[in-house]
Amino acid sequence: MIQYVTAGESHGPALSAIVDGMPAGVPLTDEAINHQLARRQQGYGRGGRMKIETDKAEVLSGIRFGKTIGSPIAMVIRNRDWQNWTTTMAQFEQPQEAIPAITVPRPGHADLAGCIKYGFEDIRPVIERSSARETAARVAAGACAKLFLKALGIEIGSIVTAIGSAKEEMPQQELAAMLAHGAEAVATQADQSPVRMLSKSAETAAIAAIDEAKANGDTVGGIVDVFITGVPLGFGSYVQHNRRLDADLAAALLSIQAIKGVEIGTAFDNACKYGSQVHDEFIFSESGELTRPTNRAGGIEGSMSSGQVIHLRAAMKPISSLISPLQSFDIASMEPIPSRFERSDTCAVPAAGVVAEAVVAPVIANALLAKLGGDHFSEIHERLEAYRAYLANRLQRKS
């Protein structure tokens, strides 16, 4: 089972990630991992931090000659901004001068609950670890799982479908045609847009929404769609709650900072219709191949993959740090006071899509390993090809 942990503070020396459980023999390159980190840093509406950092993963263990060796993969991403925080974020040395404590929590952030939970008089430690800067380490970890899956013919990609009131307008038929070439083809096209949207009209409206929010000292959220192609039928299980693929994917997406809602397929629209209008029928083609003309279930039925494209949506709330502050209070004096501003983005929805790709990758990889087993890439690949051949034969109508 692939598991990972991250460590590090937003303005500490570095972020780190350890990925455990990766099979041996998986081809990985530092260029591919760093490409994912670069994708995370893109996007219109980002703040000053992205002008400072150029994220690169330094691999410390678990890879030899471009292939995994079955031991934990350890990676470090240096924080270039650390040089400006060596006193404020010193690990051991006591500052010669008192550093003012941060005592005003931001509405919508982890500040208040984290400060009370862990007994801090200063909110700074909460800010440092709850920051979305941590997602850089998760993107590096998820990149390893993404590359493992890609080598097996499974691709993960994302697009932005809404920023504020700006909505993606690309016809579903056109999107489906792109997905026929794999999820990465869609993501690659989205990456050409500063807001990772596919249509020019939606891009223009999204940029205008971000500009308006910035001019007003505000922030704006949005929606990202994640697609996973190449997943065969039968990953996941209905047998126990903790083996349900949809539950694991939703949990992974909700673990991302500021993601507050998840949809699988057209779930919320489905909820307002009759069953006869919702469920995806089984239709045999003239050649006897089993087909599904629709995919309203989003590629998951009974908590298992259906063999169709897995389609997930994640709703990202507007970022909590506002230049125009909301009302708050001082936890030291308990007096009302406007909230404070911590350097932040106006919009990070484009980056959220890249993070979403990263966090769902280990979920799919683990579902694959649970189904097929294997400690080395070659045996896993062989078993997957045999399973795909079995499915093709099993689901073919005999004449």
Swiss-Prot record:
Co-factor note (free text): Reduced FMN (FMNH(2)).
PROSITE patterns documented for this protein: CHORISMATE_SYNTHASE_1
Pfam families membership: Chorismate_synt (PF01264)
Listed GO CC annotations: cytosol
Enzyme type, top EC level: lyase
Residues the entry annotates as binding FMN: R129, S130, S131, Q257, A258, G302, K317, P318, I319, S320, S321, R343
Biological pathway: Metabolic intermediate biosynthesis; chorismate biosynthesis; chorismate from D-erythrose 4-phosphate and phosphoenolpyruvate: step 7/7
Catalytic activity, as annotated: 5-O-(1-carboxyvinyl)-3-phosphoshikimate = chorismate + phosphate
InterPro entries: Chorismate_synth, Chorismate_synth_AroC_sf, Chorismate_synthase_CS
Protein name (database record): Chorismate synthase
Designated gene of the protein: aroC
